[in-house]
A protein has these predicted regions:
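Surface-exposed, charge/polar-rich loops and edge strands
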Residues: 1-344
């Protein structure tokens, strides 16, 4: 299977550059199994589309302002993108510079303080920050939000609220779990009234999510690692939902990635640690019955994942419909409610 199998042409004007004024006003394409027709709805219609006893699983990661700028003591400019906080004022980062920094090198940060290069881990570096607050707290005012590269503007104050889900809690992501951005408190309240249950996992979206697949032969692709936590409470909610014939619905591909990584011996088990799972057609997703997901980049691993879930032909048919109907694409764009193709 090749990366080029997942290419499609997208008019640039359909790439959403900013969120809508109201989170749940985003459009929602309902994609049932073929040959049923697509329907064009809005995210705020979800209470009508779901059933009492359904379980929505959200990713409660919180985005950190992970982009920093500075200069080496030699004078060269440096851009830093934090991949993961390691504790003890240390972080694993990506560094953009004209020359790779060496261990022991010091970066003077534009927002005050400095960072020492402790070493290298593949494409990443480990830095120790010398700043006057705990690193996580310092980043809140010193860091810049790392909007995806296809959003062609600088982040503003509004992005600090809108590029964050309303249920974000566990600090550690460098990108938002974007399907969750569509949910606001009024919608969550209406879903509760409908009898829909909620659960949470944590997956800290890493900088690798911005990296393109660099090989055409997908068997040679090395998937990036991300930290996840699937707790015992969520596992019990899933078990109870299944026992009562409810549906487990993932809010986003990050939730699917976390749940699939926590499957053991035919069932979901509590799990905390790193995942490197790569889901593409041929893999059967067993942990969820439907998912809400945004529209993904051509040739991306996320497009491959949803193709594994609903069938590549069905997904590409849905994307053609979305382009024709002028849906908004990518992180600040619209969403789909996606159901799997029946087996056989």
């Amino acid at each position: 299977m090749k990366k080029s199998d997942f290419h499609y042409e997208l008019p640039e004007e359909l790439i959403a550059q900013a969120p809508l004024a109201e989170r749940s006003a985003s459009r929602l394409m309902v994609v049932p199994p073929a040959p049923a027709a697509f329907s064009d709805r809005h995210v705020r219609d979800l209470p009508e589309l779901l059933q009492p006893g359904d379980l929505l699983v959200f990713n409660d990661t919180r985005v950190i302002p992970a982009r920093l700028f500075g200069q080496k003591t030699s004078g060269g400019r440096v851009e830093i993108l934090i991949e993961r906080l390691l504790g003890g004022q240390q972080a694993r980062v990506q560094i953009g510079a004209s020359k790779s920094p060496k261990p022991g090198g010091v970066i003077l940060l534009d927002t005050g303080g400095q960072a020492e290069v402790l070493g290298r881990e593949g494409e990443f570096y480990v830095l120790r920050f010398e700043v006057d607050e705990p690193l996580e707290k310092w980043l809140v005012h010193a860091g810049r939000l790392p909007l995806p590269p296809y959003i062609q503007r600088e982040p503003d104050q509004a992005d600090r609220e809108r590029y964050q889900t309303v249920f974000a809690k566990e600090v550690g992501a460098v990108a938002a779990p974007t399907a969750g951005l569509h949910f606001d408190e009024p919608l969550l309240a209406r879903l509760r009234e409908r009898g829909v249950e909620f659960g949470h996992v944590t997956l800290h979206v890493g900088a690798g999510t911005f990296q393109p697949v660099r090989v055409d032969e997908l068997s040679q692709h090395v998937m990036h690692r991300e930290w996840i936590n699937v707790g015992a409470e969520l596992v019990e909610k899933v078990r109870r939902t299944r026992a009562n014939s409810g549906r487990v619905i993932a809010i986003g591909t990050t939730v699917v990635r976390a749940l699939e990584s926590a499957l053991r011996d035919g069932g979901l088990q509590p799990f905390s640690g790193e995942t490197q799972i790569f889901i593409l057609p041929g893999y059967r997703i067993r942990s969820v019955d439907a998912m809400v997901t945004n529209f993904h980049l051509p040739e991306s691993t996320l497009l491959m994942m949803i193709s594994a879930f609903a069938g590549k032909e069905r997904v590409f048919e849905a994307y053609r419909h979305a382009i024709h109907q002028r849906y908004r694409f990518f992180s600040y764009g619209d969403a789909m409610l996606l159901f799997p193709q029946p087996e056989g």
